[in-house]
A protein has these predicted regions:
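Extracellular mucin-like PTS domains
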Residues: 66-77, 87-88
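Non-catalytic C-terminal accessory/binding modules of secreted extracellular proteins
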Residues: 81-85, 97-98, 142, 239-264, ...
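C-terminal segment of classical bacterial N-terminal signal peptides
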Residues: 19-26
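Bacterial N-terminal signal peptides that target proteins for export
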Residues: 1-12
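Extracellular hydrolytic enzyme modules, especially secreted metalloproteases
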Residues: 226-388
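Secreted, propeptide-processed cysteine-rich mini-domains
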Residues: 28-42
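Extracellular disulfide-bonded cysteine-rich modules/repeats
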Residues: 45-53
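Zn2+-dependent metallopeptidase catalytic core
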Residues: 81-267, 274-275, 388, 450, ...
Length: 468
């Protein structure tokens, strides 16, 4: 009916124009009449015309009318309805790989698989943390240190709320002036990332008279803008590399972190560095190769086997999220969001994957258990506001292998990209990123399992089957 009404209005309008032309002067514009110059506009009897080219001629065409009503129509595309997997999975407990890495056996302070290790930040709860600006007589700070940190604190808190699905939150205690640390800043000069307990002890002692450290679980130091004393970063954590608790009048500080000059260069930032280091306070592992932090060895994938697809692989991105496996082992991926199957029982299965950062119901990760220490994980990715925009960071599916015999900082998660993919450059100040996201129609096969992305809309629809 809407189409008929619109046609009737246009028909009546055409008749009105036709009859009106009988009394128009010769120079007046008439629909279909000749005009002199393309683009010329003229109004006659409240109807606007524009001169357009029609074949070899130039003619007047109605542009708009002050009296004619315009009817617009829109097409509403219904949201894609979520559909459950076509086969029933195994118990999600079957996908709780038990860690068997040399690193865990030797140190026992960070985990890459089950059971999780506690002792520092709990997997749920609210954590009080402090931002403490610090300067020295020979390295004075600017007038308003919080001006460059307030948005960073919010991004930090929002990120943890997203990846934990609200299970953890942070309360920030801030001091709006620089705390003057005695002596020279050069005493604490640090060229590479690592512990800096002497600096932290001196800074917290200087801050103690001004700041109430009651209940503070971690301190994030903010050095002066533009400083070059701390080139990369300085951090230490309970049970890892903190030599001893740092005393205050209200209780000991067990974790600290300081973002150095490296993070002053955009698009790097403070908040993603704080997130990465806070991940270690939750006892989560580095997914990068820690023995190759400065590119000492040329590698096919420079950062490590998970490239730039996890905050615990590279806080600079491009993808600044947390993989479904790390969410699973810490308790941030609900069991109902996981499809688990043992390889022996795997039949061809179609699964709709809900993008991993969504807060809606649906399977977010499909895991196929290959052995007691190995799993293939499949998850849906979407670019997010936390990310650094890059060609490799796009909508699609990520497939990777988890090896529970490989520990913290040794590459426990390995991407499985489609055949022929390589490294892609980016504007995130990171090395080339492995082009690992599956597009629609792409498939990968590993460890006897084939994963194919068959559709991508609100959800990513995949097919998983035994190879061959």
């Amino acid at each position: 009916m809407r189409r008929q009404a619109t046609n009737l209005k246009l028909f009546c309008l055409s008749l009105a124009i036709l009859f009106a032309t009988t009394n128009l002067p010769a120079s007046a514009a008439v629909n279909g009449g000749k005009c002199a110059k393309v683009g010329q506009v003229q109004t006659t009897k409240s109807i606007s015309y524009v001169c357009v080219k029609s074949g070899k001629k130039t003619v007047w065409q109605i542009k708009s009318s002050s009296t004619a009503a315009t009817t617009t129509s829109t097409t509403t595309i219904p949201a894609e309805k979520y559909v459950a997997p076509t086969t029933t999975g195994a118990s999600t407990d079957d996908c709780k790989l038990v860690e068997a890495s040399p690193e865990r056996k030797r140190w026992g302070n960070i985990f890459v698989a089950f059971p999780p290790i506690g002792g520092n930040f709990e997997p749920t709860g609210t954590f009080k943390v402090a931002l403490v600006p610090i300067d020295w007589a020979d390295l004075p700070g600017e007038a308003n240190p919080l001006a460059r940190a307030t948005d960073q604190m919010k991004l930090f808190s929002d990120w943890f709320d997203t990846v934990s699905e609200g299970k953890v939150s942070f309360v920030w205690s801030t001091y709006d002036k620089y705390v003057r640390v005695p002596g020279s800043a050069l005493t604490y000069k640090q060229a590479q990332s690592g512990g800096g307990d002497a600096m932290a002890i001196a800074a917290i002692a200087a801050a103690d008279p001004f700041i109430d450290f009651t209940g503070v679980r971690a301190v994030y130091f903010l050095p002066p803008k533009g400083q070059q004393v701390f080139v990369e970063s300085s951090q230490a954590f309970k049970d890892l590399n903190l030599m001893a608790p740092i005393p205050t009048k209200e209780g000991a500080i067990m974790n600290y972190a300081l973002a150095g000059a490296y993070f002053d260069t955009s698009p790097r930032n403070y908040w993603s560095y704080w997130v990465h280091e806070t991940g270690h306070m939750f006892k989560l592992p580095d997914l990068k190769y820690n023995w190759n932090n400065h590119g000492e060895v040329a590698l096919a994938v420079p950062i490590g086997p998970f490239s730039g697809f996890d905050m615990l692989s590279n806080q600079d991105g491009p993808s600044r999220t947390l993989s479904s496996w790390l969410r699973w082992i810490i308790g941030w991926l609900p069991a109902e969001s996981l499809y688990c199957q043992n390889y022996a029982n795997l039949a061809k299965t179609t699964i709709m994957l809900n993008p991993i950062d969504n807060r809606t119901t649906g399977v977010k990760s499909a895991m196929i258990k290959i052995s007691a220490t190995k799993i293939i994980a499949v998850e849906s990715r979407r670019p997010a506001s936390f990310d650094c925009a890059a060609p490799t960071n796009r909508a699609g599916v990520l497939v990777y292998i988890v090896d529970a015999t490989v520990g913290h900082g040794e590459g426990t998660q390995t991407l499985v990209p489609p055949s022929g993919r390589g490294l892609v450059s980016n504007n995130c100040n990171t090395p080339g990123i492995l082009d690992a996201i599956l597009n629609v129609g792409d498939s990968v096969t590993t460890n006897g399992v084939t994963v194919k992305l068959v559709k991508s809309s609100t959800y990513d629809t995949i097919e998983i089957s035994k190879a061959g």
